[in-house]
Amino acid sequence: MDILQAIEERHSVRQYADKAIEQEKRQALCDELKKINTESGLNIQILFDEPQCFDSMMAHYGKFFGVKNYIALVGKKGKSLEEKCGYYGERVALLAQILGLNTCWVAMSHGKSAAKIERGEKQVCLIALGYGKTQGVAHKSKAMSEVSKTDVAMPDWFKKGVEAALLAPTAINQQKFMFELSGDEVFATVYGFGFYVKTDLGIAKYHFEVASGRSVK
């Protein structure tokens, strides 16, 4: 499976089988996180065999069951933190999909995580991780015209990027992002209000860049 296939096949999964993640897959995820943290300055952490965080009333209310592994998206407080966590967190989530694992972005439906949060840092959200009991289902998406703008005929690479962005997971499926092509540059912004819209924007930007081969401002 390549990363484009992973974007198409990754769906949110909330219920997990009682199956341990193999050591080689753990190592691959840890190696990727090390690269990401060096590149981004974030402090993303992965917690294996830690069931307490999702053994809570909030987690069960959110219909999470069997979650024993998760990724904690942590970084220094700042205006760009949420977007960076979305961008780099999805990079890990897609690697997990390539490795045959399942994931789900989790905002509030969990208990206290075991991540180590240093002074001046903040935990933005978590990503549940493991072998899902199902592969999840596709979410409904907005029309391409609702999340993109161009002042010229839409290039094929831009179309591919927007299509991939529409496959990005967003909080309560809100998809409050906009991609605009101006000249040869792409700008992505949040429009409207909502929970975790900046995190959603980061996820969508990563999808766009992977599928289009172009950077987004």
Locations of regions flagged by a protein language model:
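Acidic, surface-exposed loops and disordered segments
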Residues: 1-217
